[in-house]
């Protein structure tokens, strides 16, 4: 199984507002940068989209070391998703999970890969995190008037 490093970030102005996402995939000495954006979105949706797009880009099942500064994504996957799945995508208060469309897509992608989650502090000089933040901000800025 190939071992891939993935670094992701999302950015948004206004929340909701224009947003962007960035992802770096690294396999051995090869790197691929991915990015995109939306005119009306939230920071959490962009953080999730970065992870989904990165995982979708992988052509085969991989062992993924996934670094993110998003506690929303990290905690959602590692703490809450098993409960949401058991409760038909509802929280403990019976209300629907926010961003359920993206959580379902993320769950589908996670089933294809073995993912080890790594939290990194954002805006703290981590080179890859700074780069994906820059990619996300560049994409976000394309939608700003």
Each PLM stretch: what is its role?
Residues 2-5:
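Extreme N-terminal starter segment of soluble prokaryotic enzymes
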Residues 8-18, 52-131, 135, 140-142:
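RNase H catalytic domain
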Residues 21-27:
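Short beta-strand scaffold segments in enzyme catalytic cores
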Residues 28-46, 57:
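A short, polar/acidic, helix/strand-boundary loop motif
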Residues 145:
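Metal-dependent nuclease catalytic cores that hydrolyze phosphodiester bonds in DNA/RNA
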């Amino acid at each position: 199984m190939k071992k891939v490093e993935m670094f992701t970030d999302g950015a948004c102005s206004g929340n909701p507002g224009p947003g962007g996402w960035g992802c770096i995939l690294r396999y051995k000495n090869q790197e691929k940068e991915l990015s995109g954006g939306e005119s009306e979105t939230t920071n959490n949706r962009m953080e999730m989209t970065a992870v989904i797009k990165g995982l979708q880009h992988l052509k085969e099942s991989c062992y993924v070391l996934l670094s993110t500064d998003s506690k929303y994504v990290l905690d959602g996957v590692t703490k809450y998703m098993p409960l949401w799945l058991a409760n038909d995508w509802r929280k403990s208060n019976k209300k629907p999970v926010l961003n359920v469309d993206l959580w379902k897509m993320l769950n589908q992608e996670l089933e294809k890969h073995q993912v080890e989650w790594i939290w990194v502090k954002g805006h703290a000089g981590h080179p890859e995190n700074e780069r994906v933040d820059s990619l996300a901000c560049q994409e976000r800025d394309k939608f700003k008037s």
